[in-house]
Amino acid sequence: MTENKKLQIKEFFLLDKSEKEFWLTKIGESDWRAGKYLFKILSEGSFNQQYGEKSKVFLLTQGNNLISFCSFSERDEIPDTELTPWIGFVYTFPAFRGKRRIGKLIEYIYRLAKNQGFKQLYISTDQKGLYDNFGFSFLQTMTERWGGETLVYQMEIVHKDYSDIIGKTVRGTIDRPLGASHPRHKEMIYPINYGYVDGLFAGDGAEQDVYVFGTNQPLKTYEGKIIGVYHRLNDVEDKWIVALDDRPYSDQEILEAISFQEQYFMGELYR
C-alpha cells in the first residue's frame, strides 16, 4: 500500500534518464498553469538557463506517486533584484493536500540554503498568508517579469545554540505513553513515550515537551539526559530529546522515531 511507503525527496537532475522521463510525466499531470510551464522548460532543457545554472528541482514522492514538487533557484520571476535564493513552482497534488507535505521540501531546501551560507530564503506568490504556515513572513510587493504584482515572503535562516541545555538531566511526567493515541487525532499512535519537564515552561506557554528514548515500555514518569533539541521552524516550541540510557542514538534514528508527529511540521535537529 502506498500509505506504508516512506516519503522520499528526489533531486530531478540527479535522476537517470528513465526516472526523469517517469517523474517528468507526473509533473505534467499537475492541474496548475505554472506546473505545466515547469514541465515545458524541463522537457526543453531550458530550466537552468532561465533560473540559474545551480538551480534545482525537488520532488516529494511516495512509491510511484508524486506528492509535491518545487524548485530551489538562483533567480525567480522578478527581474533586477539581488534577492536570492528562491523557492518556486510550489505544488502539491490535490489527493495529498491537507497534511502540509510541501513543508518537507521547504525544510530540505532550508537546510541546503543554510549549508550554503545563505541568511534568508525567498518565495514569490499571489497567495496572501499561505506561507506564514511554513515559517515565512511578508517582505514586500514587487513587480514580476510580466508586469503584474507579486507578494514576496522571506524566511530567516537561523543558527540556534542549545549548548546550555544539551547534556543536562531532567525529570518529568509522561502524559502520552508509548502506545497511547493523540487526544485530538486518534489515528496517531505514540511509538515512544512523550511528556514534559515538570515546572519548566516553553514558548507556547505550556510545560516543555520531551520525546523519551531508551525504553520499549510505557512510562508514567521519567528521568534522563537531554541528547538533542528538535527546533520547529514553523511553530513557537522546541521538542527536547531525552535518553534514559547512554546509547549513542543517531540523528536518523531520532528523526525516524519522532516523524509520526513531526512530519506535520518543519524543523531541524540540534545535537
Q: Which residue stretches match the model-derived regions?
A:
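Conserved beta-strand in the GNAT
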Residues: 57-59, 65-75, 86, 91
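Conserved acetyl-CoA-binding loop-helix of GNAT-fold acetyltransferases
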Residues: 92, 98-111
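Hydrophobic N-terminal alpha-helices or hydrophobic patches in metabolic proteins across all domains
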Residues: 159-271
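Conserved active-site alpha-helix within GNAT-family acetyltransferase domains
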Residues: 119, 125-149
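Short amphipathic alpha-helix that is part of the acyltransferase structural core
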Residues: 2-46, 57
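Short loop/turn motifs at secondary-structure junctions and domain boundaries
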Residues: 48-53
